[in-house]
From Swiss-Prot:
Cellular component terms (Gene Ontology): endoplasmic reticulum; endoplasmic reticulum membrane; extracellular space; Golgi apparatus; Golgi membrane; plasma membrane
Residue ranges annotated as motif Cardin-Weintraub: 33-39
Organism placement in taxonomy: Eukaryota, Metazoa, Chordata, Craniata, Vertebrata
Positions bearing the site annotation: Cleavage: 198-199
Binding site for Ca(2+) 1: 90-91, 96, 126-127
Subunit structure, as described in the record: Interacts with HHATL/GUP1 which negatively regulates HHAT-mediated palmitoylation of the SHH N-terminus. Interacts with BOC and CDON. Interacts with HHIP. Interacts with DISP1 via its cholesterol anchor. Interacts with SCUBE2.
Region annotation 3 X 8 AA tandem repeats of Q-V-D-L-Q-S-H-H: where it falls in the sequence: 386-409
Protein name: Sonic hedgehog protein
Length: 444
């Protein structure tokens, strides 16, 4: 009964915090009432969604190699004979009908949207799989992962909205490439990129209180790790739990390097960059790892002086590694491999994410008082202080006694609270507000 009561209280807190003010007052729509369809905005000429390069982890992912009729991978391409789609097929070989299953699924969904948007008009494909080398090197057309589309009436005034419909249909990258067509592409079948989530690799290291470092995979409730408050002051914060943890999974990580430091994190995870104001001072801005570019300034930590320094990014690369861990601290930040990062992913507003997790932090604090556990530190660890350096701050309601609401031993996978927030986010937020790789999936 107590567990059920706690769950209901948490759910109430979540709804209170994540519901925009416009939905929290006034007549609004009641529970169970029909949702009003959201207004769709046409793409502008040369606009692409998401706003990253096509072959990056945040969009359709890496080029994996040209597929020919003699390739082993050719059998993975499937013909699309949907009668609601017109295929130009100027080569008269049927090549434009061949595509990956993911591309086919998105195209079929788009065909329905087109007929609903413009009765009597069909979706038209001008380019699909390319076996003749008509596109640029490493084009996804060579893998059957890209299509160029128009409407059957070739009314160019419709193409901006056609692009928007393609985004809504689930294409991983949509580009209003030419006034003559819209370009769309998808991730590779069963690609690692499609399941990246928001984490750090198992071997990433954090700095613990009283000196020394620890692999992120070895963190336990009661540990205090180097973190930062909202003003950029370094301090040691309570480790609460893992938002996500998978020991043996292989994932692609962005490797962001400065002249002396290197941090690895998945595409949808947030990193802090320095943003210069008009008066010359710098402020923190949270940015998806997939959007970090050479020349950006990120923050590195000096544990001896307990200060942060803005340092230029020299190189951004991709690397596959084993294990995926997303630690949550009381302050919502963590210094990983001596680089300051957010504990959050999916949405590019660190402050919103930290607020959304407030009910969980409160519930964990309450749980520590109701079910106190032995305060002695685990074997091999030095004792921790009873309070944080900034214990007067609201975010420090938690103490080193904290435990997960479910269990001291957290199961692998994404925490139920994170899954719940993600689901609520998909209901309340525009699809462009969430990173396309923000929540790991079990299928691509």
């Amino acid at each position: 009964m107590l567990v059920a009561t706690q769950s209901l209280l948490l759910l109430s807190f979540i709804c209170t915090l994540v519901t925009p003010p416009g939905l929290a007052c006034g007549p609004g729509r009641g529970i169970g009432k029909r949702r009003h369809p959201k207004k769709l905005t046409p793409l502008a000429y040369k606009q692409f969604i998401p706003n990253v390069a096509e072959k990056t982890l945040g969009a359709s992912g890496r080029y994996e190699g040209k597929i020919t009729r003699n390739s082993d991978c050719f059998k993975e391409l499937t013909p699309n004979y949907n009668p609601d789609i017109m295929f130009k097929d100027e080569e008269s070989t049927g090549a434009d009908r061949l595509m990956t299953q993911r591309c086919k699924d998105k195209l079929n969904a788009l065909a329905i949207s087109v007929m609903n948007q413009w009765p009597g008009v069909k979706l038209r494909v001008t380019e699909g799989w390319d076996e003749d080398g008509h596109h640029l090197e490493e084009s996804l057309h060579y893998e059957g992962r890209a299509v160029d589309i128009t409407t059957s009436d070739r009314d160019r005034s419709k193409y901006g909205m056609l692009g928007r419909l393609a985004v809504e249909a689930g294409f991983d990258w949509v580009y209003y490439e030419s006034k003559a067509h819209i370009h769309c592409s998808v991730k590779a079948e069963n690609s690692v990129a499609a399941k990246s989530g928001g984490c750090f690799p198992a071997g990433a290291r954090v700095m613990v209180e009283f000196g020394g470092t620890k692999a992120v995979k070895d963190l336990r409730p009661g540990d205090r790790v180097l973190s930062s408050d909202p003003q950029g002051n370094l301090l040691y914060s309570d480790f609460l739990m893992f938002i996500d943890q998978e020991r043996d999974v292989k994932k692609l990580f962005y490797v962001i390097e400065t002249s002396q430091r290197k941090i690895r994190l998945t595409a949808a995870h947030l990193l802090f960059v320095a943003q210069t104001k008009v008066n010359g001072t710098r402020s923190f801005k949270s940015v998806f790892a997939s959007n970090i570019q050479p020349g950006d300034l990120i923050y590195t930590a000096d544990p001896k002086t307990m200060t942060l320094k803005a340092v230029k990014v020299e190189k951004v690369d991709l690397e596959e590694d084993t294990g995926a861990y997303a630690p949550l601290t009381a302050h919502g930040t963590v210094v990983i491999d001596q680089v300051l990062a957010s504990c959050y992913a999916v949405i590019e507003e660190h402050t919103w994410a930290h607020l959304a997790f407030a009910p969980l932090r409160f519930g964990m604090s309450l749980s520590s008082y109701i079910y106190p556990r032995d305060s002695s530190p685990p074997s091999g660890l030095q004792p921790h202080h009873q309070v944080d350096l900034q214990s007067h701050h609201q975010v420090d309601l938690q103490s080193h006694h904290q435990v997960d609401l479910q269990s001291h031993h957290q199961l692998e996978g994404i925490h139920w609270y994170s899954q719940l927030l993600y689901q609520i986010g998909t209901w309340l937020l525009d699809s462009n507000s969430l990173h396309p790789l923000g929540m790991a999936t079990k299928s691509s």
